[in-house]
Amino acid sequence: MSSGDRKHASGGAVTVSRMRAMKREGRPLACLTAYDYGFAAACERAGVDLLLIGDSLGMVVQGHETTLPVTVDDMVYHTRCVARACRRALVVADLPFMSHTGVEQGLHNAGRLMKEGGAQMVKLEGGAEQAALVERLAQNGIPVCGHLGLKPQQVHKIGGYRVQGREQADAERMEADALALEAAGADLLILECVPAVLAQQLSERLTVPVVGIGAGGGCDGQILVLHDVLGVTEQPPRFARAFGAEGGGVHAALEAYVAAVRAGTFPGPEHGFEA
């Protein structure tokens, strides 16, 4: 099947406007991370809607304990590998740690991910303090995905990988951050390790799609790290489900994940967090 046939068979490429339409129609987005051509192609065949080249590659590909050592050059390389495989899925690339400390630096590095890597959207961690950068990126035609809740690039500041937004003040701050990012021009938001009730409230409040990871089933879509889905992670997080451990091989695991997200059977209550 040619690339054009694949696009036609899957209903066309996933775009910002298509994701908004899916939110309006109540059709969940099935998203995964990917870091190379082979697995990205497998995700394409399984019908994954969005592929994130996450700085999580620092941990699952490079073997670091955190995402902090990942460089922009690393991200460009892996984004380029993934983008070559994608005809339908939206390609999103992370701005890694310390790559967007100022608006001009962030614009330059986001431009690299788009021009050199082939990304169609960039993701950055942070709330209202990133609004100026988000606005500048949007003005330059660069789609943006925000990231709130647990922000792995701040792991040392927050004291580990912990659920965020359980306290009322924290929940209110997260809502304000989400609204600020949307107002600045963000096109998508990822919520990580957030109480399910709060995540659903934010999903209903925002007009842009909200994708959860460890944020319950009330979001507009779900994303997991590929390695967790395939069951190759030694100690997977509690919000993940190892579809690959259920038998059938890589393609069966990816198809099962996509089907479960679209049917609303994943995540279950056991994969989320209470306030």
Swiss-Prot record:
Keywords: Cytoplasm, Magnesium, Metal-binding, Pantothenate biosynthesis, Transferase. The keyword Transport does not apply. Its main location: cytoplasm. It catalyses: 3-methyl-2-oxobutanoate + (6R)-5,10-methylene-5,6,7,8-tetrahydrofolate + H2O = 2-dehydropantoate + (6S)-5,6,7,8-tetrahydrofolate. Its EC number is 2.1.2.11. The active site is at E192 (proton acceptor). SUPFAM superfamilies: Phosphoenolpyruvate/pyruvate domain. Mg(2+) binds at D55, D94, E125. Pathway: Cofactor biosynthesis; (R)-pantothenate biosynthesis; (R)-pantoate from 3-methyl-2-oxobutanoate: step 1/2. GO terms for molecular function: 3-methyl-2-oxobutanoate hydroxymethyltransferase activity; magnesium ion binding. Transmembrane segments: none annotated. Binds 1 Mg(2+) ion per subunit. GO terms for biological process: pantothenate biosynthetic process. It is an enzyme of class 2 (transferase). The keyword Transcription does not apply. It is found in: Cytoplasm. Its cofactor is Mg(2+). InterPro entries: Pantoate_hydroxy_MeTrfase, Pyrv/PenolPyrv_kinase-like_dom, Pyrv_kinase-like_dom_sf. 3-methyl-2-oxobutanoate binds at D55, S56, D94, K123. GO terms for cellular component: cytoplasm. Belongs to the PanB family. HAMAP family: PanB. Catalyzes the reversible reaction in which hydroxymethyl group from 5,10-methylenetetrahydrofolate is transferred onto alpha-ketoisovalerate to form ketopantoate. Homodecamer; pentamer of dimers. This is 3-methyl-2-oxobutanoate hydroxymethyltransferase. It comes from Halorhodospira halophila (strain DSM 244 / SL1) (Ectothiorhodospira halophila (strain DSM 244 / SL1)). The lineage of its organism: Bacteria, Pseudomonadati, Pseudomonadota, Gammaproteobacteria, Chromatiales.
